[in-house]
Curated annotation (Swiss-Prot):
An annotated GO cellular component: plasma membrane
Subunit details: The efflux pump is composed of EbrA and EbrB.
Assigned protein family: Belongs to the drug/metabolite transporter (DMT) superfamily. Small multidrug resistance (SMR) (TC 2.A.7.1) family. EbrA/EbrB subfamily.
Subcellular location, record wording: Cell membrane
Protein function: Part of a multidrug efflux pump. Confers resistance to cationic lipophilic dyes such as ethidium bromide, acriflavine, pyronine Y and safranin O. The efflux is probably coupled to an influx of protons.
Keyword Cell membrane part of the UniProt annotation: yes
Bilayer-crossing regions: 2-22, 35-55, 57-77, 84-104
GO molecular function, one term: transmembrane transporter activity
Name of this chain's protein: Multidrug resistance protein EbrA
Highest rank taxon of the organism: Bacteria
Protein's organism: Bacillus atrophaeus
Length: 105
């Protein structure tokens, strides 16, 4: 099971990097960040496919999408100076709570 969570962590990080590079690529006008988008998302989906050999789909996908959303929001705030209001913070806390509850066994 631990190896599944390692694969899932790599998938989440890769997906978040890919999302950040989507913004940097300026609509795929810049080739280097565009290439990183393709590489990061390819790695993310490959790692997610490996995760599914160890963790059920319902748990894997919910964790991947929830934690990926939170991480992408953090990247947006930290590196792209995007603002997050109170509703956004509450949403992030709810996502984190949901992921924790799903993984609590």
């Amino acid at each position: 099971m631990l190896v599944g969570y390692i694969f899932l962590t790599i998938a989440i990080c890769s997906e978040s990097i890919g999302a950040a590079m989507l913004k940097v690529s300026d609509g795929f006008k810049k080739w280097k960040p565009s290439a990183l988008v393709v590489i990061a998302y390819s790695l993310a989906f490959y790692m997610l496919s490996l995760t599914l050999n160890h963790i059920p789909l319902s748990l894997s996908y919910a964790t991947w999408s929830g934690v990926g959303t939170v991480l992408t929001a953090v990247i947006g705030v930290k590196w792209f100076k995007e603002e997050l209001n109170a509703k956004g913070l509450i949403g992030i806390l709810l996502l984190i709570s949901g992921v924790v509850l799903l993984n609590w066994q």
